[in-house]
Every structure is written in C-alpha cells, then in structure tokens.
Amino acid sequence: MGNYDFTKQPSLLIQGAMDTETAYLIEHLEEHACITIGNWKFHTGFLGTKREPVIISKTFQGIVNAAAATSLALAYFKPWAVINQGIGGGHDKKFHRGDIVLGEKIVPMGAVAYAFSKEGAGIDAKGFSPLPVEIFCRETGKTKKVTEYPCDIRLLQVAEQVETKYHTGRGVIGSGDEWN
C-alpha cells in the first residue's frame, strides 16, 4: 500500500492528548510517515492484521488544542471517523483502572451554571446545571443549543464487538479543561 494517499482515501483518525496515549500506536504503524501541520504532527500508516489505514495525532492537553488538531486533520486528511482516546479520571464505580469506557455521549464539563448563592456562602458543587453550548447543525443549516453530543451508534456497536482482555462498558465522556 505504498501509494496510499491519506489525503484522498478513507482512513481512521485516532487522537490522544499525551505521548502515553499515542506512542504505542505510533510505534506499531507499518509504513509510518509523519506530516507536520502547524504545531501538530500527524502520523500515517497501517495498523493490525487487516492493515487499517490510520492517522494518529497527539493533540496536547486541553479542549482548544484538541479542537485545533481535529480541525486540521479533518481539513487535510478527511478521515471517515475520529476516535479520541486517552487516560481519564473515572467517576463511575463500575469502572476501574485499565477499563475501557465506550462513549455513548460527550458532555462539556466546563459549560455549567451554578445556582446563585449569597456573598461568602461559596459554591455548592452539586448545585449546578449544564449550560447549553451553541453549535452549527449541518442538517438544518442553523445553529442550535446542546448540552451533550451523541456518539455514532454504529461505531459504538462495532467497538463493543472487539474482543479484548479488558473490561469494557458504555458510559458518558466528560470533556473539559479540568483535571483531578
């Protein structure tokens, strides 16, 4: 597949914020090439026994970096799907270190409104509600406000069929510039 054109032919974009999330995949690429766009490096090649064409990028931490890297990759490569994977802090007791959470939906964790409290009372961490984020809807050509982003159900179903030694389960993925 030495003449595979990642800018014109279908490929899967896999992203992670840190080296610990992307290095293993990059090390296992066959026919590895690296393309630099702005401050981001995009590694192309083939993974697995079926030699799937993939693009792997380290986005760096934070939603702005992730958005920039994703936008560049979408404009340059035109992947058929994007998988964001990485290490996260879990808040669901059914998941443990090493488990794989398959996202049913993504919620913007930093977009919240807290209930008013009197001066000096502080903030009640449980007294918040999601703050809708305005996005552009391609289907209608208009903007709409959302508090969550659904994940692609077909990709979710395929991911559930992958055999792995790790525990997997569906869950909600929170995205934001917040670390614990």
Give the positions of each predicted feature:
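Short Gly/aromatic-enriched secondary-structure transition segments
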Residues: H28-H32
